[in-house]
Amino acid sequence: RRDSLNFSISLFAETASALIGLDLDVRGRENLWKQRPAIFMFNHQSNADMLIMASLIRRDIVGVGKRELKNLPVIGPLMGAAGVVFIDRSDRHAAIETMKPLVQAMQEEKKSLVIAPEGTRAPTRKLGAFKKGGFHVAIQSSVPIVPVVIHNSGDISPKGDKIFRSGTVHVDVLPAIETTDWSVANIDERVADVRNAFLRTLGQPELSVEETAMARRDTPDDLKPEVRGRRKKAGLKNSASDPSEQDSVPPKRRGKRGICLL
């Protein structure tokens, strides 16, 4: 079953990429294979990120996804078969409990975890605040973290758009970060270190440990998953509070043909 699943993941990645016309320009590809199992953390801009990560990791993976993805045609069942854990982002404590089987999968089955520490797609190219869930898993499993920095997947499928467009996405796979000496006591420092590695690679200003810890609290209310969920149920539009951030949203390429996979 495991070999069949690995084959299905690779086949899906290759077939979907060919249909879309998606090419990957990857620097540091060797870091994908130097240490397994690992926790592959990626910054989340687009629905295309799932396809990108499947194309890169290819085998023996488990993942975390928002509960809403479970009901998507094609992608939802495939993610479920691949062992993706679907979480309710509005219930923090339940989400933490749901992630516990991931540690067992990594330790006993030697599978790698694929996770977006931002917890949701960023509405702009600016890196969002990091949640601690993946870092707690790293502490419990003692497996290394491999940062996967995706630069422009929003060009392929901007947030809010179900159409995938052809193009080249640039990716940096950074060297593995060991976690064997990590503890809950220094988790804020570790989150800041990993997030700053992303910021450096993206060409964005780094933050101190204190600034990183404050970033989640300072996230505009209408960008927080739990608030977005309440607004959606009420029929209200979700948008960034700061209008200046809207200018950095990757533009939709009008008139270019695309394909809908969702």
Spans of features found by a protein language model:
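A generic structural signal for well-ordered alpha-helical segments
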Residues: 16-17, 79, 106, 138
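A generic local structural motif
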Residues: 24-28, 48-50, 99-101, 157-159
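Membrane-proximal helical "anchor" segments flanking the first transmembrane region
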Residues: 1-39, 238, 245, 253-262
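Thr-Gly-centered strand-to-loop micro-motif
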Residues: 27, 64-66, 88-89, 117, ...
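Non-catalytic C-terminal accessory region of glycerolipid acyltransferases
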Residues: 96-262
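Catalytic core of membrane glycerolipid acyltransferases/transacylases, capturing the structured
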Residues: 3-11, 17-21, 34-92
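Generic preference for hydrophobic
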Residues: 26, 40, 63, 171-173
